[in-house]
């Protein structure tokens, strides 16, 4: 996979080492660019361009540790209509490496759903669940991706 970076303190080699052990988005390039956030806190930002066959990850600059609430599922509530509550987990990203790993896995799952499963790729909760369960693991497999397609009652981090 072709890897490029315009983030000053993150080289393509460091990016490759950070995602070593993760599945590759075959035929796609990976770009890492700065996110110059406005306001008082950084946030997560990445996208997959299926026409250009690329994954772009934005790393907050300057980098400061930050928290994000990650939705990993929804639970139906009794009553009339389609009522539900989001199941979420708070995550603190302490390093740009953690942000890179989380966002890469999230975007890889979009790639997997479209390119390998042939389904719609707009499954944000599934992609978040996959990234949340796996971004701290040394090795991530296709089996991990298949497990993320089935929501469990609890999420496993680490």
Q: Where do the PLM segments sit?
A:
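Short catalytic/ligand-binding loop motif for oxyanion handling, primarily in non-cytosolic enzymes
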Residues: 64-67, 111-113, 120-121
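C-terminal capping/extension segments of zinc metalloprotease domains
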Residues: 29, 49, 140, 152-158
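Amphipathic alpha-helical segments that form well-ordered structural scaffolds
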Residues: 14-21, 104, 126, 130-134
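Active-site recognition of the HExxH zinc-binding catalytic motif
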Residues: 102-115, 127
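A metal-dependent hydrolase signature that marks the N-terminal structural subdomain at the beginning
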Residues: 1-74, 79-93
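Post-HExxH zinc-binding segment in Zn-dependent metallohydrolases
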Residues: 120-152
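Hydrophobic (often cysteine-bearing) scaffold residues that line and stabilize catalytic clefts
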Residues: 11, 101, 123
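Alpha-helix-centered segments that form part of catalytic cores
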Residues: 86-107
């Amino acid at each position: 996979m072709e890897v490029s970076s315009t983030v000053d303190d993150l080289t393509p080699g460091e990016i490759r080492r950070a995602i070593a052990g993760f599945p590759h988005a075959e035929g796609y390039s990976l770009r890492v660019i700065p996110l110059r956030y406005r306001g008082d806190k950084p946030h997560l930002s990445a996208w997959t361009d299926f026409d250009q066959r690329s994954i772009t990850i934005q790393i907050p600059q300057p980098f400061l540790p930050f928290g994000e609430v990650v939705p990993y599922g929804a639970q139906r509530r009794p009553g009339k209509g389609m009522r539900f509550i989001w199941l979420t987990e708070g995550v603190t990203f302490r390093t740009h490496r953690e942000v890179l790993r989380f966002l890469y896995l999230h975007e890889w799952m979009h790639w997997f759903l479209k390119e390998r499963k042939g389904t719609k790729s707009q499954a944000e909760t599934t992609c978040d669940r996959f990234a949340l369960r796996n971004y701290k693991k040394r090795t991530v497999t296709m089996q991990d991706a298949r497990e993320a397609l089935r929501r469990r009652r609890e999420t496993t981090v680490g």
